[in-house]
Structures are given as C-alpha cells and as structure tokens.
Amino acid sequence: MAIKIMIADDHSMIREGLKSLLELEGDIQVVAEAEDGVDCLEKLKICTPDVLLLDINMPRKNGLEVLQTLKSSKSKIKVLVLTVHNEV
C-alpha cells in the first residue's frame, strides 16, 4: 500500500520538485498540495495523508499555526517540517 503524502509550501517550484522526487518511489503517492496554511487545513478536511510535508514560512497561516491546529485536533498525521532560511 502506498504512503499518502500532502505537500504544503507557498512556492510552487518546491511543491512540484518534491512531488516529482517522491513519485519516483513506487510506494509513495502525493495525494494533495497546498499553497498556504489555510489551504492546507481546508484540504485536510477532505483528505487524510499519512505524512504532511509542511513549510513554516507561508502566507495567511504559517506552518506553526497549522501544527497547533493539528495538535489540538489530536491528528495522527505525521508531520515533517521543511523550510528555507536565507542569511545575508
């Protein structure tokens, strides 16, 4: 049975790149993508992935706020936090 993954990141190029890499594996299926935290939580109402790849820095609702919502709802979804931090 395939592992169901959702990708939540505000950069479409990152979502597409992760999806392409993950789908090279035969036992992984990307079941949903979200462009921000609000979109992520809405899609989680209709889709239950095994794993959520979650960016921290997103508009409207950031990844930490999404994590708090998942924690308060006692979600069983495993979350892997991915983020980019640029230093000058």
Each model region followed by its residue ranges:
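Conserved sequence signature across two-component system core domains
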Residues: A8-D9, A34, L52
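Active-site residues of response regulator receiver
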Residues: D9, D55, T83
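Short hydrophobic/Thr-rich beta-strand motif most characteristic of the beta2 strand and flanking loop
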Residues: D27-E35, K43
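Acidic catalytic/metal-coordinating carboxylates
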Residues: D36-D39, N62-E65, N86
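Short amphipathic alpha-helix used as the core "switch/output" element in two-component signaling
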Residues: E42, L64-K76
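Active-site beta3 strand of CheY-like receiver
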Residues: C47-L53
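Receiver (REC) domain active-site loop signature in two-component systems and cognate sites
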Residues: M58
